[in-house]
Swiss-Prot record:
Binding partners and assembly: Interacts with components of the ubiquinol-cytochrome c oxidoreductase (cytochrome b-c1 complex, complex III, CIII), such as UQCRC1/QCR1, UQCRC2/QCR2 and UQCR10/QCR9. Interacts with components of the cytochrome c oxidase (mitochondrial respiratory chain complex IV) complex, such as MT-CO2.
Transmembrane found in the keyword field: yes
Name of the protein: Short transmembrane mitochondrial protein 1
Tissue: Widely expressed, with highest levels in lung, skeletal muscle and heart. Expressed in bone marrow-derived macrophages (at protein level).
Gene induction: Down-regulated by TLR ligands, including bacterial lipopolysaccharide (LPS), in bone marrow-derived macrophages.
Superkingdom to which the source organism belongs: Eukaryota
């Protein structure tokens, strides 16, 4: 039980540290880009 608690606590501390210091990719922007790409592929070229 003690080993589990130590591992759990250490994991949380490391996770919080990484979350604060690691620049997360902007998922909302990525989704918008993917949507635009899909819409562009669906539309036939108007030439």
């Amino acid at each position: 039980m003690l080993q589990f608690l130590l591992g759990f606590t250490l994991g949380n501390v490391v996770g919080m540290y990484l979350a604060q210091n690691y620049e997360m990719p902007n998922l909302a922007k990525k989704l918008e880009e993917i949507k635009k790409d899909l819409e562009a592929k669906k539309k036939p070229p108007s030439s």
